[in-house]
């Protein structure tokens, strides 16, 4: 058997069927490990031909994931969540890649939320006892991959598979309350894990605990600042702390400048820089920043290792450029940028009204500038 899919689930009747249908023609077996569902999750798994197993929940996502890996018989494993989908792909061509003995793992292109760009994430790896997850929450396969490679070698490849995440809809309150104690335990076990600190800060914010959120952002910023070789995702604490400062009307200019020095290819940081300048009334400086965001997006010269809101690559900087030129009373250029924004988001009433206003104001200025007879 070549290829297995491994899932852990609990009360996923809303998402599971679509997930299993999306991978059924790609893999040879589907392992579903249920950690205590009380809805139709188990029935759906069986209806779709999955091999269903139960696992007592131990407040440890890695333990559940590793149990699923223990049950898989394929030479390769895809790990996927119930609220994710694999987009149609050339299954035969992809499976041919798995026959290459020089590879130990492959990344997929993951869209983490609706309307986001994709980023590479390691989801496919050899079925080997050395390769196991670690981490009570936000479980991580990289330590297992690195252990395998240190003993046996192997390359990391990129696949054509595209996954999209369909979750994060509706009220997340109960999920946040569930994850909060797990994150606290995980950070006691691994206090240097950047992603866990970011998640903790975001949960505190979502639960209205702004002060605790700020403390978490400060803690993780200190961790990142000590890194000799920061990764792309290490920009997230800067973004989180900058947004916290902006929400509380605090000056974030020094922090944004530091962040851009450390992560010059991160478009979200540049966009936030432009917003800060614009809000401070520095419209000419902001124009240069938003033009940089647009040109970088068009040329593809930015950090693709993290996901962005797709609007940040076009309509957001266009609308901010339009606003800057409006504030500078250059209604002609402002109207042109609102028109470009409308071409992307044709249903946006605000852009339509402001474009019309720019046209009227431009005519008014021209009339005032005409010489008297």
Sequence positions of predicted segments:
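Conserved donor nucleotide-binding strand/loop of the catalytic core
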Residues: 42-67, 71
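N-proximal low-complexity "stem/linker" segments adjacent to membrane-targeting elements
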Residues: 1-22
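A conserved acidic beta->alpha catalytic loop
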Residues: 22, 26, 34-46, 57
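Catalytic-site signature of metal-activated, phosphate-bearing donor transferases
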Residues: 63-69, 75, 80, 86-215, ...
């Amino acid at each position: 058997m070549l290829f297995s899919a491994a899932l852990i689930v609990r009360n996923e009747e809303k998402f599971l069927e679509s997930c299993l249908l999306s991978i059924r023609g790609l893999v040879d077996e589907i392992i579903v490990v249920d950690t205590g569902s009380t809805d139709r999750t188990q029935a759906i798994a069986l209806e779709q031909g999955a091999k269903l197993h139960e696992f007592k929940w131990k407040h440890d996502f890695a333990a559940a994931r590793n149990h699923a890996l223990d049950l898989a018989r394929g030479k390769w494993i895809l790990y996927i969540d119930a609220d994710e989908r694999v987009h149609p792909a050339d299954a035969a061509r992809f499976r041919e890649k798995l026959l290459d003995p020089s590879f130990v793992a492959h990344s997929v292109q993951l869209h983490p939320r609706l309307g986001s760009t994709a980023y590479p994430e390691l989801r496919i790896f050899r079925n080997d006892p050395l390769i196991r997850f670690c981490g009570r929450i936000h479980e991580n396969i990289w330590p297992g991959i690195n252990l395998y490679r240190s003993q046996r070698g192997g390359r990391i490849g990129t696949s054509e598979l595209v996954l999209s995440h369909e979750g994060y809809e509706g009220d997340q309150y109960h999920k946040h309350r569930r994850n909060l104690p797990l994150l606290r335990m995980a950070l006691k076990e691994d206090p240097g894990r950047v992603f866990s600190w970011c998640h903790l800060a975001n949960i505190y914010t979502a639960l209205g605990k702004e002060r605790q959120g700020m403390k978490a952002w400060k803690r993780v910023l200190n961790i990142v600042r000590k890194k000799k070789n920061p990764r792309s995702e290490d920009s997230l604490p800067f973004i989180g702390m900058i947004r916290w400062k902006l929400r509380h009307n605090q000056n974030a200019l020094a922090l944004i400048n530091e962040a851009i020095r450390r992560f010059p290819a991160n478009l979200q940081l540049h966009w936030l820089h432009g917003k800060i300048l614009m809000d401070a009334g520095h419209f000419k400086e902001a124009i240069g920043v938003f033009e940089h965001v647009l040109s970088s997006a068009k040329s593809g010269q930015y950090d693709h290792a993290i996901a962005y809101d797709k609007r940040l690559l076009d309509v957001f900087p266009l609308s901010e450029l339009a606003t800057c030129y409006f504030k500078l009373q250059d209604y002609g250029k402002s109207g042109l940028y609102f028109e470009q924004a409308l071409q992307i988001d044709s249903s946006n009433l605000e852009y339509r009204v402001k474009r019309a206003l720019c046209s009227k104001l431009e005519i008014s200025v021209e009339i005032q500038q005409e010489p008297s007879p």
